[in-house]
Regions:
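Alpha/beta-hydrolase superfamily serine-hydrolase fold, recognizing
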Residues: 1-295
């Protein structure tokens, strides 16, 4: 019954997102100076959920560092097109950006998503290696930020990868950009009350991956790379970013939190979904500079 209710609500939200995206793309043009190679099949199976867009600067297209971006949507909805302008903006900061689609819950669970995105990150890593670069950076918003943390942590923690039944990504993860992260999935809140069974599978509390459902434990166990977190007044998951930053900062001073307390409230994932706004331009500029320092 709960899953049926979630599906129905998700369908409505997906329709709203599509309407917003169509309007936003009409109003905000795609920037000049960016070359888009769309819908590359990174799994080789022809499925729409396994397509990936690649954004390259028109000038010096094979010289910049490689960045992989994961869209948000709470694992239930979302699509790579929502982050189209964000990826183009990061491309203008000098990155070649890989933005993969991935299958969504409840059709699949989180471990399936991990496996598929591992292939996408490895593809991006091959491009980085061809450029003589040692690894890639990851960035994501909301659920995409969670995916950055977990894929990076599993690379450094074989026991965690084994508990997930996932082969770790091959390239070194040099740094993370985490926008409005949906880091916590099992708390007693509006997310944790319904999502865990669909995300981790029924009976997840008795399985080896359970300790890693706590992102703070995951970050400590996985030796998280330098991370730049973005949130703001108005972000309904602002407390997640603040709490997660406090947790990871106990172990390393390499992390940074940009917490905007401006004159107006900003929406969740504003930096990814509205990159043309002044606040997002500033946030993304700071994040790009942080990532470039670690590439």
């Amino acid at each position: 019954m709960l899953e049926g209710m979630v599906r129905k609500q998700t369908e409505k939200q997906a329709q709203t997102l599509d309407s917003w995206l169509e309007k936003h793309d009409r109003e905000v043009p795609f920037p000049e100076g960016v070359r888009l190679h769309g819908d590359q099949d990174y799994m080789g199976d022809g499925k729409p959920c396994h397509r990936m867009d690649v954004y390259e600067p028109e000038l010096n297209s094979k010289e910049g560092p490689v960045l992989v971006n994961f869209h948000g949507g709470g694992f239930l909805l979302g699509k790579k097109q929502v982050n189209r302008l964000f990826c183009a903006d990061m491309c203008l900061h000098g990155f070649t950006v890989f933005c993969p689609e991935y299958p969504l819950v409840p059709e699949v669970g989180i471990f399936d998503i991990f496996r598929d995105l591992t292939v996408a990150v490895n593809r991006a890593g091959e491009e980085a290696a061809a450029r003589g670069q040692d690894g890639v950076c990851l960035c994501g918003d909301s659920a995409g930020a969670y995916l950055c943390v977990y894929l990076a942590a599993m690379r450094e923690n074989p026991a965690m990868a084994e508990a997930a039944g996932v082969s770790p990504v091959v390239p070194r993860i040099r740094a993370l950009g985490l926008i409005s992260g949906m880091f916590y999935t099992c708390r007693l809140d509006s997310i944790g009350m319904f999502l865990p069974d669909m995300l981790y599978g029924k009976g997840w509390r008795k399985r080896p991956f359970r300790p890693y459902t706590d992102p703070e434990y995951t970050a400590r166990a996985g030796n998280l790379p330098p991370s730049f977190l973005v949130t703001a007044r108005g972000d309904f998951l602002r407390h997640y970013s603040r709490r997660f930053y406090r947790a990871i900062s106990r172990d390393s001073a390499a992390h940074c939190l940009l917490d905007i307390q401006g004159d107006r409230p900003l929406s969740h994932a504003f930096a990814a979904m509205l990159p043309e706004t002044p606040e997002a331009r500033d946030a993304n500029g700071q994040m790009a500079a942080f990532l470039l320092r670690h590439c």
